[in-house]
A protein has these predicted regions:
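Active-site catalytic microenvironments for nucleophilic, acid-base chemistry
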Residues: 57, 61, 65, 109, ...
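Glycine/serine-rich loop-strand microenvironments at binding/catalytic pocket rims
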Residues: 20-49, 144, 210-211, 216, ...
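A short, basic N-terminal segment
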Residues: 1-44, 61-73, 78-80, 429
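P-loop NTPase nucleotide-binding core
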Residues: 39-192, 199-201, 218, 376-378, ...
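C-terminal leucine-rich, beta-strand-based interaction scaffolds used for sensing/assembly
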Residues: 2-7, 319, 323-429
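Short, conserved phosphate/pyrophosphate- and ester-handling motifs at nucleotide-, phospho-/glycolipid
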Residues: 23, 52, 290, 416
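An amphipathic alpha-helix signature
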Residues: 99-107, 255-263, 280, 365-373
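The catalytic "switch" region of P-loop NTPases
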Residues: 6-10, 182-191, 197, 201-288, ...
Length: 429
C-alpha cells in the first residue's frame, strides 16, 4: 500500500504544534511579544523560511496553548500569569489597495474560525468554543456554528456606521472586547493577525491606524516578506515605540533544525518509513535552511519510495530525486517559475545559473546576500552569452516572476531564495 507523503511532510502552513520543528529563539520571542501589555508584533523574512507556520504557532500561544513551548524545553519562559487572547487571523491579497480596503475586508470576513465577524456579538448567532490543537489542555477559541436568522447583519451590540469602515471596525472591536474577550472568555485581549501584509498595494497610513487601535486589550501582529519593519509598514515611525518587544525576523534554519524536520517526519510515519544514516543530513544540505524546500524534497523521496517499494529512504532514492530535480521533473511549481524566467533562451539560462551560484556574503539584515551582475558578466561572455544586457531585463520583469529585484545599479537580489537554490541544483536549460 502506498504511503501518504502528507503524513510526515507538507508544503502547507504548519498549524499543528506537533509538526513544528526548531526555531527555539523565535519561540522565546513569541512568548515575550505576546506577554507585553501593549505592542505590535512584526514577523518578516524571505520566502520559504516558514513565516506563516510560525504565525500559526503564535496564534496557538496567544490562546494559552503552550505545548510547543514545553516540548521545546522552554517551560521556564512561560510567565506565571501568561496573557491570553481571542484571535482573528486574516490572509491579505494583492487586490487590497490600502488601509481602508483592508479594514473593509476585516469587518466583512465570515470565516467561521478565523474571521473578525464571527466574534461580533449577535443574539441569533450560535458560537461554540473549540481547540485549534490536538492537545486536551489547549486554550479555546470561538467559532461560528450557525449565523442565525439575521445572517451576518450587525446587532444591537455593535453599530455599523454607514460609509465609515474605520469607525465600524472600532465599534466591532470594542463590542468583541467587552462581550467575548472579557465577559464570556475572561481573556486579556484580542489579537488580530494579518498574514501576507506585504502584498497590500498602498500601506501608507497603516502604521498610524494600527497605533491608534492598539490598546492593552487589542494587539496586532503583521507578517510578510521583507528585510525589516520598513518593508512591511510604510509609516513605520508611527509604531516604533509599540514594537520594541515584538520584532521577529525569520532567517533560514540551521542544518541541525532542517535535519529535525526529517526526524520529526520519521516519528509521524510511525515506523512505516525509515531514513538511512546520513540521509537526513543530505536532505538538509540540499534544502539550505529553507523548511519549505526540505519538505518538498522529503515528499518527493516518499513518492520515489512508493514507486520502488520498501520502507527505507536511502542514498539511492535521494539521488533519484536529485536526478529528477536536475532534469526539471521533480518540482513542477519551481520548474514553471524557472522556465518562465529563462523564456527558452540558453543564454539567459546560463546567466541565471551564474547569478544563482555567485558567492554572496550574509549579513545581519540580508541573510540571502545580493548578486552583482559584473561579477558574472565575463564568465557569461566566455560561455557564449554575447548580449548580457539584452537577456537580463526579463529576469527583473514582474510578468515573468520576477526572479530578481534590482537593488542598485548592477546589484540584484533573488526574490525567492528557494527558487535560487533550485536553480543551483538544476541542470542548465
Amino acid at each position: 500500500m502506498a504511503i501518504d507523503p502528507e503524513v510526515g511532510f507538507t508544503a502547507d502552513v504548519i498549524r499543528d504544534p506537533g509538526r513544528f520543528v526548531g526555531r527555539t529563539e523565535l519561540i522565546k520571542d513569541c512568548i515575550t511579544a505576546l506577554n507585553a501589555t501593549t505592542g505590535l508584533i512584526s514577523v518578516f523574512g524571505k520566502r520559504g523560511v516558514g513565516k506563516s507556520s510560525l504565525l500559526r504557532q503564535l496564534q496557538q500561544m496567544a490562546l494559552g496553548e503552550y505545548a510547543l513551548v514545553k516540548s521545546a524545553g522552554l517551560t521556564n519562559y512561560i510567565p506565571t500569569r501568561a496573557r491570553s487572547y481571542l484571535t482573528v487571523y486574516y490572509t491579505c491579497d494583492a487586490l487590497i489597495k490600502d488601509g481602508r480596503d483592508l479594514i473593509s475586508r476585516l469587518i466583512n470576513d465570515q470565516d467561521p474560525e478565523d474571521g473578525l465577524l464571527r466574534l461580533v456579538p449577535n443574539d441569533g448567532k450560535d458560537i461554540v468554543e473549540f481547540s485549534r490543537s490536538k492537545e486536551v489542555s489547549a486554550g479555546a477559541d470561538l467559532k461560528v456554528v450557525s449565523w442565525g436568522a439575521k445572517g451576518v447583519e450587525s446587532s444591537k451590540y455593535a453599530k455599523v456606521v454607514p460609509n465609515d469602515v474605520i469607525q465600524t471596525f472600532r465599534n466591532f472591536v470594542s463590542a468583541i472586547v467587552e462581550h467575548q474577550v472579557q465577559r464570556r472568555m475572561h481573556r486579556d485581549g484580542l489579537l488580530i493577525i494579518l498574514d501576507e501584509f506585504d502584498v497590500i498595494q498602498d500601506k501608507q497610513g497603516l502604521g498610524s491606524l494600527i497605533k491608534s487601535l492598539s490598546t492593552p486589550q487589542v494587539k496586532f501582529a503583521v507578517c510578510g516578506v521583507g528585510r525589516d519593519l520598513n518593508d512591511l509598514i510604510a509609516d513605520h515611525a508611527s509604531v516604533e515605540r509599540l514594537i520594541e518587544q515584538g520584532v521577529l525576523a525569520i532567517r533560514p534554519m540551521s542544518l541541525a533544525e532542517s535535519e529535525g524536520i526529517i526526524y520529526r517526519a520519521a516519528e509521524l510515519f510511525k515506523g512505516t518509513v525509515r531514513f538511512a544514516p546520513g540521509t537526513a543530513a543530505a536532505i538538509a544540505a540540499l534544502g539550505q535552511g529553507y523548511p519549505y524546500f526540505v519538505q518538498l524534497i522529503g515528499k518527493q523521496c516518499i513518492n520515489e519510495l512508493n514507486s520502488r517499494g520498501g520502507d527505507t529512504i536511502d542514498d539511492e532514492i535521494l539521488q533519484a530525486v536529485v536526478s529528477g530535480l536536475k532534469a526539471g521533473k521533480a518540482f513542477p511549481i519551481l520548474e514553471t517559475a524557472y522556465q518562465r524566467a529563462i523564456g527558452g533562451s540558453e543564454g539567459r539560462a546560463i546567466l541565471l545559473h551564474l547569478l544563482a551560484e555567485q558567492a554572496t556574503e550574509a549579513s545581519t539584515t540580508d541573510e540571502i546576500g545580493r548578486v552583482v551582475l559584473k561579477n558574472s558578466r565575463t564568465v557569461a561572455e566566455e560561455l557564449g552569452v554575447q548580449f548580457v544586457d539584452q537577456v537580463m531585463p526579463r529576469l527583473v520583469e514582474a510578468r515573468y516572476g520576477p526572479v530578481l529585484e534590482r537593488i542598485d545599479q548592477g546589484v540584484y537580489e533573488f526574490v525567492n531564495p528557494v527558487l535560487r537554490q533550485y536553480i543551483r541544483l538544476r541542470d542548465i536549460g
